[in-house]
């Protein structure tokens, strides 16, 4: 009995020793995994800078885009051409003629009106449709010309071409933006400031002479208006009488 008890007691530490070795192995694995995670978390990442432009480098025969990083100490390439941003671009680049760039200056808001710039004002071709004429008249005028001078140039060109109907140079004319515009342009307005190259010209309507002359056509216009009203009433009465006769004839035939 004592031997069996002693064997059991001796065998128990062996079993406990086996279990403790297993727990030590699992603990060692846990510690190693934890150390690996801490090492991966402590890895330093390189900082990336976002730059507006990409520099193209050639490595052998292949072309690829490469962005220089200041952290690596690579030298930055100097730009050969300066970058011009949109706010620095002047509005004169949208002018119709390159010679307009010389006319603009920061001290003058409307250089076309100045006397010093009128001699150097550029010329443009405008097309003017004349009332009653089949096609427009093309004339070359300066941007500094006003409406009155433009009308004279167009009338002279119209008469030289021999168009019909013939125009009297002494008569007054009006210049409009288009055929559908009611209000005419003022004679002092500058062609360069209007922003249009096509116009419509027609004869100016005659003005009434005086107060007495204006009253007489008003009275004469009342007379035909009263006659028209009476004629309309007579036509209505005649239609009613005709229809009543037709209805009467139909009733007689039915009976």
UniProtKB/Swiss-Prot annotation:
InterPro entries with a match to the protein in the record: At4g22758-like (IPR040358), DUF7054 (IPR055482)
Biased composition (Basic residues): 1-10
Origin species: Arabidopsis thaliana
Biased composition (Basic and acidic residues): 44-61
Region (Disordered): 1-78
Leader sequence residues: none
Recorded superkingdom: Eukaryota
Designated name of the protein: Uncharacterized protein At4g22758
């Amino acid at each position: 009995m004592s031997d069996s008890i002693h064997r059991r007691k001796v065998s128990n530490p062996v079993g406990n020793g086996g279990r403790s070795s297993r727990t030590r192995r699992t603990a060692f694995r846990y510690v190693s995994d934890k150390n690996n995670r801490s090492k991966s978390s402590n890895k330093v990442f390189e900082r990336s800078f976002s730059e507006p432009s990409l520099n193209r480098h050639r490595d052998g025969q292949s072309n690829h885009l490469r962005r220089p990083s200041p952290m690596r100490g690579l030298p930055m390439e100097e730009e050969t051409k300066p970058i011009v941003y949109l706010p620095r671009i002047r509005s004169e680049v949208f002018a119709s003629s390159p010679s307009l760039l010389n006319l603009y200056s920061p001290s003058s808001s409307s250089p076309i009106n100045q006397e010093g710039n009128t001699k150097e004002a550029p010329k443009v071709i405008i097309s003017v449709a004349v009332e009653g004429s089949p096609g427009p008249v093309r004339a070359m005028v300066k941007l500094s010309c006003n409406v009155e001078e433009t009308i004279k140039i167009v009338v002279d060109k119209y008469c030289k071409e021999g168009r019909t109907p013939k125009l009297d140079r002494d008569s007054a004319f009006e210049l409009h933006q288009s055929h559908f515009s009611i209000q005419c342009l003022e004679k002092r307005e500058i062609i360069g400031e209007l922003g249009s190259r096509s116009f419509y010209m027609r004869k100016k309507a005659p003005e009434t002479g005086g107060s007495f002359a204006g009253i007489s056509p008003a009275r004469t216009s009342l007379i035909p208006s009263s006659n028209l009203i009476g004629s309309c009433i007579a036509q209505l009465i005649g239609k009613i009488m005709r229809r009543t006769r037709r209805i009467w004839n139909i009733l007689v035939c039915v009976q």
